[in-house]
From Swiss-Prot:
GO terms for cellular component: cytoplasm. It catalyses: L-glutamate 5-semialdehyde + phosphate + NADP(+) = L-glutamyl 5-phosphate + NADPH + H(+). It is found in: Cytoplasm. InterPro entries: Ald_DH/histidinol_DH, Ald_DH_C, Ald_DH_N, Aldehyde_DH_dom, G-glutamylP_reductase_CS, Glu-5-SA_DH, GPR_dom. This is Gamma-glutamyl phosphate reductase. Keywords: Amino-acid biosynthesis, Cytoplasm, NADP, Oxidoreductase, Proline biosynthesis. NCBIfam families: PRK00197.1, proA. The lineage of its organism: Bacteria, Pseudomonadati, Campylobacterota, Epsilonproteobacteria, Campylobacterales. One of its GO terms (biological process) is L-proline biosynthetic process. It comes from the Bacteria. It comes from Campylobacter curvus (strain 525.92). Its EC number is 1.2.1.41.
Amino acid sequence: MSEILNIAKAAKASCEQLLNLSAQAKSQILNAVADELVRQKEAIKAANLLDLKAGENAGLSAALLDRLELTDARIEAMANGVREVAKFDEVVGEVLGGWRHPNGMQITKIRVPLGVLGIIYESRPNVSIDAAALALKSGNAVILRGSAAAISSNKFLVNLFNETGAKFGLPKGAVALVESTDKEAVGEMIKMHEFIDVLIPRGGKNLKDFIIQNATIPVIETGAGVCHIFVDESADVREAVEIIKNAKTQRPSTCNSVECVLLHERVAVKVLTSLARELDGVQLRVHEDLWAKFGENLGEISGDLDANLSGLKAEVKIGESSNGAQLVKADESDFGTEFLSLVLAVKCVSGVAEAVSYINSHSTHHSDAILSRDYANIERFLNAVDSAVVYANASTRFSDGGEFGFGGEIGISTQKLHARGPMGVRELTTSKYVVRGDGQIR
């Protein structure tokens, strides 16, 4: 019998015990796990260092190494997220509605767990703790399958969760890690419809496409984040630059960082000039139309000449690094690309109508924003952009379960069925009807 089959059977068997686990016991487990994360911070970092060294030797990109790293701040954030989940009201058994049938039967709709969750994810070891905490709070068992790059970190974190949880009644098998790093293990796991109720992939496009195309289990797709920010002509330029800077540079390897900025044609050169000055270390890939417009206004641009931006303290260099950004002419393939690095595509549009149309056809329907002071344009954008999260005058970096008050997330769903956006405890439940009668027949 395979490792995964044993894990899946044990997870399914734990579901009934999880239903009987009290809200108090769940909170005790989660608070104890949070305390243990902080107490064992150095041991966690030591396990993580093994993964980081292996990743460096394997030539992982800076973006992937950033996702992989567990710093003091990230471990503290994990612990705080678990504590937040522990504070949530109990959702299992929540009454969602009810009515009396004409024949006297009482019909009640209640919230129940999904069952066994299968989480397949890449790089980020914090997902192990986030997923386990949210699964427990929502009454679900969870099978975790992380990447080979994070195997030491994931083993340590899942063992910590289980050893701590067992002291307070966590059922055996309720939180499990598939330790096999063979790709065949994923292929086996995604066909176990008898034991696993839903799959939630978190990773790159290739992983998600493989699971969607081959799974025999329902999948909640957590899509890539090709996030856009549209700067309207009425936007406060200084504020817009600060928001874009945050959305691109705070943590560029995340799915909620901005990948493309659309500039209203009437303010495009002004905003691009400010971005070029302020976004240190960022490569701005400028669409050819805006590239020409920029050159017409500020002097001829050449791949080996400096563009002296009059009235600015900084000098922006075309095609090479400077104290500000690096400007290069974009290829069409740059638009619609998730860079996950300090690269930003920039394009100008005629107004909000073109911005909406462009985003709906080029984004991954994750998180998109408008920066504007025009109420009508803001409302048009928020209503028409078909994404899981839409913003007015705020950074896309807030698309996060913790920031939304969920205490972490199982993923950010970009599909429309079962859940959409950051998925917290409630999104990991479904419903059932309880009908109480007194001998009624039809």
